[in-house]
From Swiss-Prot:
Its main location: membrane. GO terms for biological process: transmembrane transport. It is a multi-pass membrane protein. GO terms for molecular function: transmembrane transporter activity. Belongs to the major facilitator superfamily. The chain crosses the membrane at residues 8-28, 39-59, 77-97, 100-122, 134-156, 161-183, 203-222, 226-243, 266-286, 302-322, 330-350, 359-379, 393-415, 425-447. This is Uncharacterized MFS-type transporter YwoD. The gene is ywoD. Gene3D superfamilies: MFS general substrate transporter like domains, Multidrug resistance protein D. It is found in: Cell membrane.
Length: 452
């Protein structure tokens, strides 16, 4: 059993590593404007920094979760930190956008390897108040996601966009040194290549990644001229992926769940919609603030704090509401506030004073905070008890799919320039997403009533 001091050091080692994925997924939002202008890119092209990160995370997290079981969690955790360190050192000196994109992929894969390894290390070595220990990781992740844009804004003022990569180094060094010292040596030797290939659905992974990449390229091409062949290839690969997952014993994504668990499927659909909505704001607003409203990167970051700050404040309150009343009412309230916020954003945001803008963003933050916590609780409530690990992994995949879809929407809307008309169009899309979330919330309430 770990002493109180050793437990704190162990958790610090894990948390300072696992926070890197949410921190880097959100800090980039304030840097897109600077990177776009430095490399002379369209928004469509620079948006690949968003979509590629989430696509790599969607593939890497479940894969590295299995790899940790096979080759050892300490080994994989430290290797993930090394990959993120490579990106932190290499990205600031990237001579081309393609080099920067590769560094961003290193960052995504490395930070994705750290999270499942960190959770596994806590489950194996912290047995007293384990739920509290895991809650620390959740709090760190939520705080980093929410505060990333604001922190990124101040870092960019200090050292330009390279600063958002360099800032990772102190956390990497801290996590690596503490982990090297605190984490027990892996019990098992590293598995062989043949064993790893047998345990991983390599074909499923390739079909999934290939299908998403081709569809992304097809959808983003709408800002210029549509690449129909890529769209057809993407659909064919995804159809082949579904067929493969239905046939194999160890699927990359267990698509059977969508057919057998209707309540859970409704949660997944709502979570995708929530993340499309949120990440359109998360990545779209900073670019609009800087390009069209000509606000400084620092001011843009402070504006984003209205939304992210309220989502942090409302999250623990939502947990208490769920404990008293269940998940149905908070899910509906979150969808209602999202829709109302989107309407206010579209109609009034451009013309109101600063306090009005802050209130609208705060309302949107409350809606997201309610939905995010309530849907996580609903996922756990509707999951079969023997499949929580699988359903939790799929839940994260839905987050990444929503994020990827938002980057496509923004790439199409803001492809050549960012204007008030494009902002209004984004607002209309968000109203549609909010309305769909409301309908799904009503549907979910009916399903839960039938189940009870």
């Amino acid at each position: 059993m770990l002493s109180k001091k050793s437990r704190a050091v162990f958790l610090t080692a894990v948390a300072s590593g696992t926070m890197l994925n949410p921190l880097n997924s959100s800090m980039i939002s304030l840097a897109l404007h600077s990177i776009q202008h430095e490399f002379h890119l369209s928004f469509t092209t620079v948006s690949w920094l968003i979509s590629s990160f989430y696509l790599a995370s969607a593939v890497a997290q479940p894969v590295t979760g299995k790899l940790g079981d096979l080759i050892g969690r300490k080994r994989l955790f430290l290797f993930g930190l090394i990959l993120v360190a490579v990106s932190a050192i290499g990205a600031p000196f990237a001579p081309t956008f393609m080099t920067l994109l590769v560094m961003r992929l290193f960052q995504s894969v490395g930070s994705s390897a750290i999270y499942p390894s960190g959770v596994g290390l806590i489950r194996n070595h912290i047995h007293e108040r384990q739920a509290s220990a895991l809650a620390v990781l959740s709090i760190f992740a939520s705080a980093m996601t929410a505060l990333g844009p604001t922190a990124g804004g101040f870092l960019i003022v200090w050292g330009g966009w390279p600063a958002i990569f360099i800032v990772n180094l102190p956390f990497i060094i801290l996590s690596f040194l503490l982990g090297l010292y605190m984490f027990p040596k892996d019990q098992k030797k590293g598995a062989g290549i043949k064993t790893i290939i047998r345990q991983l659905d390599i074909l499923g992974i390739v079909l999934f990644a290939g299908g998403i990449i081709f569809l992304l390229s097809f959808l983003l091409s709408f800002s210029t001229s549509p690449h129909a062949v890529e769209g057809v290839l993407g659909l064919l690969l995804l159809c082949a992926f579904v067929w493969r997952e239905l046939k194999t014993d160890k699927p990359f994504i267990d698509v059977r769940l969508f057919k057998t668990q209707r309540n859970l499927s409704a949660v997944y659909v709502q979570f995708i919609l929530l993340n499309v909505f949120f990440y359109c704001l998360f990545f779209g607003l900073p670019s609009y603030f800087q390009d069209e409203m000509h606000l400084s990167v620092q001011t843009s970051g402070l504006f984003m704090l209205f939304m992210s700050g309220m989502s942090i404040v409302v999250s623990p309150l939502t947990g208490k509401w769920i404990d008293r009343s269940g998940v149905v009412k908070p899910i509906f309230a979150g969808a209602l506030l999202m829709t109302a916020g989107a309407v206010l954003l579209t109609i009034f945001f451009i013309n109101v004073q600063t306090i009005g803008k802050g209130l609208i963003l705060s309302l949107l933050g409350i809606g997201y905070g309610l939905g995010n916590v309530a849907l996580q609780a609903a996922m756990l409530e509707t999951s079969p008890s023997n499949m929580v690990g699988t359903t939790s992994g799929l839940f994260q995949t839905c987050r990444y799919l929503g994020s990827i879809l938002s980057s496509v929407i923004l790439g199409i809307l803001f492809g050549k320039e960012i204007t008030a008309a494009h902002f209004d169009m984004m607002g209309i899309i968000m109203i549609i997403a909010g309305g769909a979330s409301l309908l799904m919330a009503v549907r979910f309430a009916a399903l839960m009533k039938t189940a009870s």
